[in-house]
Amino acid sequence: MTTKEQFFFKGATSKNKIHFISLGCSRNLVDSEVMLGILLKAGYEATELLREADYLILNTCGFLKAARDESTDYLQRIINEKKETAKIILTGCMVSKHKEELKPWLPYVHYVLGSGDVEHILSAIESKESGEKLSSKSYLEMGEVPRKLSTPKHYAYLKIAEGCRKRCAFCIIPTIKGGLRSKPLEQVMKEFRLLLKMGVKEIILIAQDLGDYGKDLSKDRKSCLYSVLREMLKEPGNYWIRMLYLYPDEVDDTLIDLMEKDQRLLPYVDIPLQHINNRVLKKMLRTTSREQILDLLTKLRTRIPHIYIRSSLIVGFPGETEEEFQELVNFVGEGWIDNLGIFSYSQEKGSLAAEMPDQIPQSVKSKRLKILSQTQKKNVEKHNKQFVGKIVEAVIDGYHPDSEFLLTARFYGQAPEVDPCIIVNEARLVSGFGERYLIEITGYVGYDLVGRVVNKVPGE
């Protein structure tokens, strides 16, 4: 797994300049946005220049070894490049679970905050005692927390819960983030309305397990996701709601009904399946079987033919045989999944799977990863060919990272950052980013579609 760094900045002139680097997932990004909001509200200014900053905050990712390596690489860079008087504040998942890996760098770190301990960022910066360790406490418990969005102004992530009650054998997230802690419905709605008021047009709901939302709050331990979605959809406006991290056992008829009835709840679901073989799923401690997965996918495709399904799969889990891997290849080859993230199993200390026998050699895992990736690439190429000549409604995100002569756009089946996009090479009609346009698909490059703007969507 690779992490995506996010830098936060604007023009800074004071002596209280801060420089943020946020690594990892969108959930980490939300924490960084809250910390940034707290500091800006307190009078600090953000700078894009590392050497200019008085305080450097690194929000680490500790999910996989590759992510931890990236975190320590960034930490070393900060130590090497910062000005002599600058202070380093370290936070995030790696701090909570893998502090021993940080030992060589800790003498250079001035403050350490636990994962999710974002509301104490101001206390950390203003503390007189270098190296103070602040208690871990999620900002979800706070009623009023400022936030500075780092995403383009037209979309934002809304984290509705923290932690996870599931205990998948390969995962250490519960030991990092703790158990499920849901925001109260009133707080979620307050944040939702605020984002709409700020002009956000696409709100992406996230949690470790979105479908578990509210099970820690309700007396019957049932999910409250349907209730919060229903409340959100009562708000007027032509906005999009996108759901990420929705486990297969939590997708029920009530959610499907909502997607059918209100187009603002996008016909897009991110369902981490991890595998399709029953024996492997059982060893992973997953709660769904092959039969249940296929029943769910069939229902989704039948009820909502235009739905887009994103998922993640793991190859090389301990004991995975060639036959079981081939079953996974066949499943992917059937084209059930539109957007797919494929990961090679990582032996994470503290996970149940790390102690399992029959660990798969890295060479075998790499080979299986390549085979499965090639299988999905064929699906994508076939799918993209069928798109050529069609006109889709898409939002213009901004300039393409490789060229300001190109723009990037997304239709409802593409989530930002994790999915492919539309490369727009004819955009004379575009008057602003964050607006929706009709785009004719003229071709494709790899996983991305290519298109030209035909017209602006009426009402935009």
Swiss-Prot record:
Q: Which positions are annotated as binding [4Fe-4S] cluster 1? A: 25, 61, 93
Q: What is this protein called?
A: Ribosomal protein uS12 methylthiotransferase RimO
GO cellular component: a single term: cytosol
UniProt remark on cofactor binding: Binds 2 [4Fe-4S] clusters. One cluster is coordinated with 3 cysteines and an exchangeable S-adenosyl-L-methionine.
The main enzyme category here is transferase
- Residues binding [4Fe-4S] cluster 2 are 164, 168, 171
Q: Which residues form the TRAM domain?
A: 385-455
Q: Which cofactor does it need?
A: [4Fe-4S] cluster
| Family the UniProt entry places it in | Belongs to the methylthiotransferase family. RimO subfamily.
Keyword terms of this UniProt record: 4Fe-4S, Cytoplasm, Iron, Iron-sulfur, Metal-binding, S-adenosyl-L-methionine, Transferase
**Where located?**
Cytoplasm
